[in-house]
């Protein structure tokens, strides 16, 4: 036991005396080091059970409700390689890039050549960029000194359209030899957008507000149900499009709209919920604090 609260305690696992029937060997070789996944030691069925119980516990313990009926978590047919967005921090010494994800509760980069949650095309994209950074000895960003150029790699992939976006986040206004990198990335089937995002702020915020197109378009397209969306590097868009459609359809079914209602969608982003509900409601109003994102479908 490492910490005790009034009604619960925190503990640290020291030894497994008898494994749960749901305990499995993580599919990812760096699962024990990377902070991206916390439940890979559980079977997928075990994860769904854990999440269902967690919702029920929170409603009862934090919300103070009792006798609440909580439906079982709806799972995916294939719970791997589902993410349509990846954000890879870049660091290490110049010529020896580390690209991957942060270790748990830290900003120490765990070099990750392969991620089991990301689209497979990301493995190829990272491999190309890693070779480029090494070959041209591009300065890599150091979060402690705020020196170096390349901070992050952001990718977005349209699940339905197959369109791909690659965004390099840089601590400056230019990327040396970017024409070489563009030519190499363009060889990937589906490549639609290659952009540079300028972030010179001395913060942990990943993206800046300034975007320059190096090749192709500034946006890619994807669908949720029958609704098409244009997605920029700055857009908020659900990272699991298959389950997003399940989630939105479930909410729409629960709403039992008859076609005369007005729906208000707060913090609407690019309007994924707004436009999905517009199929049934009379009026839908989306409210967004970021003007550029809010105007994406105007």
Regions inferred by a protein language model and the residue ranges of each:
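Rossmann-like S-adenosyl-L-methionine
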Residues: 177-188, 192-297
